[in-house]
Amino acid sequence: MVAPAGEQGRSSTALSDNPFDAKAWRLVDGFDDLTDITYHRHVDDATVRVAFNRPEVRNAFRPHTVDELYRVLDHARMSPDVGVVLLTGNGPSPKDGGWAFCSGGDQRIRGRSGYQYASGDTADTVDVARAGRLHILEVQRLIRFMPKVVICLVNGWAAGGGHSLHVVCDLTLASREYARFKQTDADVGSFDGGYGSAYLARQVGQKFAREIFFLGRTYTAEQMHQMGAVNAVAEHAELETVGLQWAAEINAKSPQAQRMLKFAFNLLDDGLVGQQLFAGEATRLAYMTDEAVEGRDAFLQKRPPDWSPFPRYF
């Protein structure tokens, strides 16, 4: 849902305190056709920046936005030289100088079957031949399951479906001045019964999670930090600089260990799917051992394997 323009998140010095430093980034090749998302790679580090690019509507998403978001995140997932994804929103709004990470689904094109493809921004431009979508949930799962650390940089509004996206990210850094958190689902007859609510309760506890959803109040970055849903609060102009510092520290560590750690943290809440992801990475580790090589080679050479050099650890 688009947050009210008159509420906090507006900046009178929006351009001068923009946390995006163009000199630190280059556009990723092959994505020149993006309209609702921007996709950059850091000039030095193994970090990419993915940003919502509809600041005039508080970075609300439509189906086309989600298509592009999934496409770039999946590209980052499959890029072996990428370790960290920074997920944020471009701004400020050209209308009023307001800032937003993402304010959720664009209610103007929400139909009975979900958010609908449209040639414009109003109900009369909807393509009735195409079914509505709720595939922002697929993006949530992609963020959750991708073997990269995803850091959400909340530089303004995180509302509705945007609030749920911040929740599902591995880490969240927020702008001291402009970050505002608001779960608007119940205001518009919607609800996130998955990660957006259940995982939020893991972060802040059941009581605070229910407060956030049932009351739909607006919270500052400091309040969410105190609750446990935000890792750190930064000055707005320094938000992406701090995000890059965190990313550099993460990228300085073992890629395999970071993957195993992410899936280990997810395992308890993700059930059999979480077990499969963790086990898959464990299998990859096993393939790297001499013991696994012996098993493969013995099969290909049609001989009994010789396990004698390999200890049975306890």
Swiss-Prot record:
BP GO annotations: menaquinone biosynthetic process; protein hexamerization
Gene Ontology MF terms in the entry: 1,4-dihydroxy-2-naphthoyl-CoA synthase activity
Keyword Translocase: no
Top-rank taxon: Bacteria
SUPFAM superfamilies: ClpP/crotonase (SSF52096)
Gene Ontology CC terms, in alphabetical order: plasma membrane
Record-marked site positions (Important for catalysis): Y115, D185, Y287
Catalytic activity line of the entry: 2-succinylbenzoyl-CoA + H(+) = 1,4-dihydroxy-2-naphthoyl-CoA + H2O
EC number: 4.1.3.36
Keywords: Lyase, Menaquinone biosynthesis
Matches recorded under HAMAP family: MenB
Protein function: Converts o-succinylbenzoyl-CoA (OSB-CoA) to 1,4-dihydroxy-2-naphthoyl-CoA (DHNA-CoA).
Family designation: Belongs to the enoyl-CoA hydratase/isomerase family. MenB subfamily.
Assembly, per entry: Homohexamer. Dimer of a homotrimer.
Record protein name field: 1,4-dihydroxy-2-naphthoyl-CoA synthase
Source organism (scientific name): Mycobacterium tuberculosis (strain ATCC 25618 / H37Rv)
Taxonomic lineage of the native organism: Bacteria, Bacillati, Actinomycetota, Actinomycetes, Mycobacteriales
